[in-house]
From Swiss-Prot:
NCBIfam families: argS (TIGR00456). It comes from Aquifex aeolicus (strain VF5). Signal peptide: none annotated. Transmembrane segments: none annotated. Keywords: Aminoacyl-tRNA synthetase, ATP-binding, Cytoplasm, Ligase, Nucleotide-binding, Protein biosynthesis. A motif ('HIGH' region) lies at residues 121-131. This is Arginine--tRNA ligase. The gene is argS. Monomer. Pfam families: Arg_tRNA_synt_N, DALR_1, tRNA-synt_1d. It is found in: Cytoplasm. It catalyses: tRNA(Arg) + L-arginine + ATP = L-arginyl-tRNA(Arg) + AMP + diphosphate. Its EC number is 6.1.1.19.
Amino acid sequence: MKELVKEKVLKALKELYNTQVENFKVEKPKEEAHGDLASNVAFLLARELKKPPVNIAQELADFLSKDETFKSVEAVKGFINFRFSEDFLKEEFKKFLLSGEAYFKEDLGKGLKVQLEYVSANPTGPLHLGHGRGAVVGDTLARLFKFFNYDVTREYYINDAGRQVYLLGISIYYRYLEKCPERDEETFKEIKEIFEKDGYRGEYVKEIAERLRKLVGESLCKPEEANLKEVREKILKEESIELYYTKKYEPKDVVDLLSNYGLDLMMKEIREDLSLMDISFDVWFSERSLYDSGEVERLINLLKEKGYVYEKDGALWLKTSLFGDDKDRVVKRSDGTYTYFASDIAYHYNKFKRGFEKVINVWGADHHGYIPRVKAALKMLEIPEDWLEILLVQMVKLFREGKEVKMSKRAGTFVTLRELLDEVGKDAVRFIFLTKRSDTPLDFDVEKAKEKSSENPVYYVQYAHARISGIFREFKERYKKDVSVEELINYVQHLEEEAEIKLIKKVLFFKDELVDITLKREPHLLTYYLIDLAGDFHHYYNHHRILGMEENVMFSRLALVKGIKEVVRLGLNLMGVSAPERM
């Protein structure tokens, strides 16, 4: 609808002033009383035309008022307010009914090669609620991009290198050694010291240790006596799942073996959790592969050649402060190991070399301070500034019976994403995670998510779809036939009531909503729109009989609710939420 008004305005500019202006706005006014859409175009022409905006707005309004698309075009304080005519709205609604979701599609992306990287949780523990929220934000954006013809790649970056993976191995070994009847106390003391300072304390670590014990018995209680090769072969032979890391990487010691084994089990669980949410990835990219292929080393050498790397205190530093970071950053420690930042730059450079024209990272809000150094490194590599976009996702607080559930990852006391999915279901999790801007904290009320009432937003929206499906089922039972869209469009002109015109408008504006949501990267606005539409529908349904009315009224109302049903279905589908036929 906005594009249509823009086209009409551009045509008027050509006819009246033989000029064009591209960057004017056509937006929904804050108050309905000001019309369906409003434009600021007159203000942008004032200098060129040497006229006050008020005069230009009036001339344009007078010209555009003759167009039958509009019921009225008014100039108000230099702005132009547009109201669509009912005849135009009804004709558009017919087009929509015949086209279905194709009516809302547009070649917005023009095949632009976009990479969306999201979740990318450390594979050292189960997914928590914050990861789940990031997953839903990323996946919904990916669905919207696909809908608007972007060439989308959904990618998960596996942080399978570095200290956190070593600490997973330490934590598993500590829990394993704890239960050894006879063990090497010196080893246990060393492992315990590291564990108590930095280890992972969740119950899942104990479960992995027990699973390991069932496979290898007590053979790792005394590491100096353990035959690492035999133990590894036993794990590979006895374990019921495919073990990628355990199989691919020859372990240096027991901790290394258990790190790989732990990685395999955690990645399996992460994939399963995401699958339960109907989230899949095109690429699972391993951080370790950047070291295996020599990409990290080559990248640091490239930055050296460009003069951005220097040595200090035995370490290699990157001059990120030259490009907006608050200080320079270490890329290689004095012990010869690379920092996470080094592999991260290599990963982004890898994305660039793969030909992505736009890269969007969905990160946890705790990464906020990390953004300037990444942007600085990309500037050094002469990658355009707008190539990388970073969306931040804030944490989720869980509430039960009005009280916050206290969680601590450090202490290993947290509700996992899997536990929440088991309790309230995928649809409630996905929908509620999108009910607020991603960069603001979200409160998740477990009781409300399970309610079958208007207080539960996902139920409220899904019920609109199910209710309309029920109307058509009842029609078939009563009249012993189905009704086609081709039949229904003949009755659209009989929709006369203010509430009906309002609903038609709401449906037709869905495309503008989707375009805005996609371009602004604000998928939460999809839930706002659907809750609003469902509310208008439920109100209409409660005050208007549909079946059993005289022919023109019944079929026109069936046409109206058919259109609403299609929009609710599409909106839910773009969020990965089901649209049930019955509830």
